[in-house]
Amino acid sequence: MSKIYLEFAATSVVLALLSFGLPGSTLAAQEHIRQGAPQAPAAQALDDATIVAIFDNANTVDIETGKLAAKRGSSNEVRQFGALLARDHDMVRQQGRDLAKKLGVTPTPPAGDQSAQEQAAVIRRLSGLLGAEFDRAFLQREVQFHKDVIAAIETTLLPAIKDEELRALVVKVAPAFQAHLAMAENLLTRVASR
């Protein structure tokens, strides 16, 4: 896997999660990633409607890539992991949508959000890979994605959430992101040794 692709994948995940009206341009975000520094936008720039949009997007992103892996994975383990991701994130996304409806919160990504285009590029890139190369790229992406989501939850989203029910939901599902990260790292180690 090329270093350029890994930077691209990491950039698109961070942008998909953190570009929702937060300070900093795409170029600034890419530079932070290249230097290894996590993007840490100011928590006060977020409101609950934007956090709901970020939460929904993070789950949608992994539903899409999980479904792709369930179809294209070259090993049964990767296909099963992809199906698990799609199923888990679909359930959590629905919980978020149900809560947003209950609270009367409309997810509001800002104008100019490029996360859909970034995710489409990730899907195109992964779709062009086959066999063990697909498995490695998918798992590397999942490791980075879950690290980025966990960091965003801990340092950006939780400190900014105003509604206690929304906070409780994010806290409740955070361990699942940790579990997915551990599974992806474990699978990546096994796939890389083949």
Residue ranges, per PLM feature:
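Hydrophobic helical h-region of N-terminal Sec-dependent signal peptides
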Residues: A10-L15
